[in-house]
Amino acid sequence: MTSRRFSQVDVFTTTPYAGNPVAVVLDAEELDVETMQRFARWTNLSETTFLLPAQDPSADYRLRIFTPARELPFAGHPTLGSCHAWLQSGGVPGDPGTVVQECGAGLVQVRRTDTGLAFAAPPLLRSGPVDVELVAHVADVLRIDQTAIMDTQWVDNGPGWLGVLLHSAEAVLALQPGVVDLDIGVVGMHPAGSLDALEVRAFFPIDGRTVEDPVTGSLNASLAGWLTSTGRATTPYTARQGTVLGRLGRVQVTRDDGGTIWTGGAAVTCVHGHVEL
């Protein structure tokens, strides 16, 4: 085993222990996939990441992202938390204004903002309408009547999200889902004039049970593309997530002059030290 630098970063919050944590191994050279997956299972966080030297010359580093069950090509809060840890540990980007992350989904740009960091999400792996039969199944596992669903859309930019729009933020907060068998992101609008525009919840299966993710960058990024393209949301806006779990997650969504959607927020380091791997 080797002593490797390690950080645990809370993402999408300014308050430690109130966002979504990610475990970051900063010196992951020579670790095999089995060791990475075993460590991710041991941390039991929604994601654990491993920083490696970039293979693409235009990237600043390469990132591998693991849930307790599998590797992901991309995920949002691990991207921001890992970038935060890399910068805090002395990482210097080739371009002072932008960090370039290499991952399974390709190259992802991360930039500093007034509130922390923001990423430009990679293209969707799957989009478009959801089959009627699957919509009925989603309503069943969410334990709601199908008429409560305003719209659905595939919004998969890596983890596999299926987006579900309900009539209100209140309806989202009231959800008590059963056992889900796919990754479901649910969103509803807060009343006009509210500090937060959207309420978001994310559910996914692990070992036959339903897990709710505290705050989800990838989902918020893909929801932003869907909701802004259909005129249901206008950037800039803030989405709230983790409320039911007692978290204070806030996700800022903006669009630049070129039409790129940036998804971001604050990050704070809660644990820093070394891990034996």
Language-model region placement:
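Active-site proximal loop and beta-alpha junction motif in alpha/beta enzyme cores
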Residues: M1-F74, L80-L277
